[in-house]
Amino acid sequence: MESRPTTIGLVFGGYSGEHEVSIRSATTVIHGLRSGENSQRYRVIPFYIDQEGRWWGEAFANRVLASQKPIEPPHSIETKGFRELPEGSETVQVWYPVLHGPNGEDGTVQGLFQLMRQPFVGAGVLGSAVSMDKLAMKAAFAGAGLSQVPYVGLNASDLGDSARREHVLDRIEAELHYPCFVKPANLGSSVGISKVRNRHELETGLDHAAQLDPRLVVEQGVDARELECAVLGRHQLRSSVVGEVRFDADWYDYTTKYTAGLSTTVIPAELPEGVAERVQQQALEACAALGVVGMARVDFFYDNTSHQLWINEINTLPGFTSQSMYPMLWEASGVTLDQLVHKLVQSAGE
């Protein structure tokens, strides 16, 4: 007797600045879940979270996927945020969040699934939350002895009055040198990041980031190669081959990251002997330090001259678009897209 397909509830969109990236990622994941043997294994029901945080069922979710961008809902709703699960959710056996940024990658949705006592793809509440907040993440990396570029952490409230603001600017200039990068602590995909080269740009960058997040980080800029490694599994983590992102822009900003032709990837990266192994090992150590399981993409900086390797960040729900490194790294490691999403769903039930 044939077993019935497992019903996957795929959640995408979300109340975050990476809403449209999530729509593109969801399209790729759904394609993988409906390809090859997966077409017999799984029944996929998409659920859409709009930019006000409201959940929508399969019919409207499919319309958003077809348009590849947010569209007007079929009827107006005055309330914002989550109120109840849409129709069709009662049949879901495994949840698959394809949400990037706050309110999706930060442990909030994972907590909902955990309260529902239903399996879900990806990291749990703790790993998701710590990985989302760059200051908490950096503290965990430091505790694990992983090398990082110098940085200064602060709160947006530190910029409140002129005296405190000047003190913050003086502190950053004393501990770092230009250029440096100002980042909101809880956004991804380079959203809200500024490269600053002087005090005026630093102040402007801090004000911009403070509008997006109450916690900020300023990192030392380094002239280094950008390397990435993918991680997969739950009880037994494994790392992929190492890839490199190359670009002609001044830095790897949102436009460069998501516009075709503005960046290229080299997989596997051409590295001196032993460097790839260091990246792969440190990627696993980073996941262990933050309690991350399921999947992750871990990013590094590498200096060709000094041979210094710095861990940059970890993404627990990495992009799954046609230009995203996570699926490409596994493809180069011998794991096709349909195999990859199958393994991710399997890991949810481990």
From Swiss-Prot:
GO terms for cellular component: cytosol. The lineage of its organism: Bacteria, Bacillati, Cyanobacteriota, Cyanophyceae, Synechococcales. It comes from the Bacteria. ATP binds at residues 173-228. GO terms for biological process: cell wall organization; peptidoglycan biosynthetic process; regulation of cell shape. Pathway: Cell wall biogenesis; peptidoglycan biosynthesis. The gene is ddl. Pfam families: Dala_Dala_lig_C, Dala_Dala_lig_N. It comes from Synechococcus sp. (strain CC9902). Its cofactor is Mg(2+); Mn(2+). It is found in: Cytoplasm. Mg(2+) 2 binds at E313, N315. This is D-alanine--D-alanine ligase. Mg(2+) 1 binds at D299, E313. Belongs to the D-alanine--D-alanine ligase family. It is an enzyme of class 6 (ligase).
